[in-house]
């Protein structure tokens, strides 16, 4: 994932112009990294060390989403819809 791509993700999910640490931005960046890694794991199914890192990212995203849901349900639902995480 390139720096330009990261900057676009931050800009599209930031609550303020200089916002880089809000849960929305963190979840969006983790989602982009997870989506970027998925083709690798479809090809290299036995990469268990890499899969452990992927599962850590998924777990961290889940914790951030739980935090956001407990703090502000409206922001949570809008983020879920924007990123397409729930069907």
Curated annotation (Swiss-Prot):
Q: GO terms for molecular function, please?
A: rRNA binding; structural constituent of ribosome
Alphabetically list the UniProt keywords.
Ribonucleoprotein, Ribosomal protein, RNA-binding, rRNA-binding
Q: Which SUPFAM superfamilies match?
A: S15/NS1 RNA-binding domain
Q: Which Pfam families match?
A: Ribosomal_S15
Q: Where is this region: Disordered?
A: 1-22
Q: State the GO CC annotations.
A: cytosolic small ribosomal subunit
Q: Give the signal sequence positions.
A: none
Q: Which family does it belong to?
A: Belongs to the universal ribosomal protein uS15 family.
Subunit structure and binding partners: Part of the 30S ribosomal subunit. Forms a bridge to the 50S subunit in the 70S ribosome, contacting the 23S rRNA.
Q: Which PANTHER family match?
A: RIBOSOMAL PROTEIN S15, BACTERIAL AND ORGANELLAR, SMALL RIBOSOMAL SUBUNIT PROTEIN US15M
**What is the recorded name of this protein?**
Small ribosomal subunit protein uS15
Which organism encodes this protein?
Leptothrix cholodnii (strain ATCC 51168 / LMG 8142 / SP-6)
């Amino acid at each position: 994932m390139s720096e330009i791509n990261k900057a676009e993700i931050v800009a599209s999910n930031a609550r303020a112009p200089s916002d880089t640490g809000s849960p929305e931005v963190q979840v969006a960046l983790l989602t982009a990294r997870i989506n970027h890694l998925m083709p690798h794991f479809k090809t290299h199914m036995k990469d268990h060390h890499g899969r452990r890192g992927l599962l850590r990212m998924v777990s961290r995203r889940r914790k951030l989403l739980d935090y956001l849901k407990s703090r502000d349900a409206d922001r949570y639902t809008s983020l879920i819809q924007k990123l397409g995480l729930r069907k």
